[in-house]
Design a protein with these regions (language model features):
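Residues that mark the start of a beta-strand
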Residues: 5-7
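An aromatic- and histidine-rich active-site surface loop
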Residues: 43, 100-115
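Hydrophobic/aromatic beta-strand patches that form the interior of the parallel beta-sheet core
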Residues: 38, 55, 101, 120-122
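Conserved nucleotide-sugar donor-binding subdomain of glycosyltransferases
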Residues: 68-107
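Active-site-proximal region of nucleotide-activated glycan assembly enzymes
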Residues: 118-147
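Gly/Ala-rich phosphate-binding loop of Rossmann-like dinucleotide-binding domains
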Residues: 25, 29, 113
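Conserved nucleotide-sugar phosphate-binding/catalytic loop shared by glycosyltransferases and other
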Residues: 3, 12, 30-80
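A short, glycine/small-residue-rich beta-strand->loop->alpha-helix junction that serves as a flexible
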Residues: 10-22
Length: 147
């Protein structure tokens, strides 16, 4: 397979949303692909050893995201999503990747379609209906008492 130009976009409102694309980007770079990883400046300290190219996104509004999530409100308002989409489209137009892979960048699916760039997303397995989790009950006295 010939090397591909791959853009990964980490919407790093939590460390997991950076860690997954960072790990995947490292594997793809080691496999010989031209990899760019985009994340906010809040994540710069985690990217200094990344061997590929990096791109700094506008701040993601972590504090507001966490507050909205905790209060059961929509995590992003329309204006924020619009701003993300505009940034996505500029990013895609600039790098023109063969594929873009996002982690919690909600706007990226629509932006990639508008720019005609194939899109994939990184999702935790526990969000899949195909996962049948096996819960192990710890062997504690309270468990024996309650059953």
């Amino acid at each position: 397979m010939s090397p591909k130009k791959i853009l990964l976009v980490a919407h790093d409102v939590t460390l997991a949303h950076l860690g997954r694309p960072l790990q995947l980007a490292g594997y793809l770079h080691a496999a010989g692909h031209d990899v760019t990883l985009a994340a906010s400046s809040d994540s710069a300290r985690f990217l200094y050893n990344f061997p590929g190219r990096t791109h700094t996104l506008a701040p993601t509004g972590k504090a507001r995201f966490i507050e909205n999530l905790a209060k059961g409100r929509p995590v992003f308002d329309f204006e924020t999503l619009k701003r993300f989409a505009e940034e996505d489209e500029k990013l895609l137009a600039h790098y023109r990747p063969d594929v873009v892979i996002g982690d919690f960048r909600i706007s990226l699916s629509a932006s990639a379609r508008r720019q005609q760039v194939p899109y994939a997303t990184i999702t935790n397995a526990y969000w899949s209906p195909d996962l049948a989790p096996r819960f192990i009950v710890p062997d504690l006295p309270m468990v024996r008492f309650l059953g």
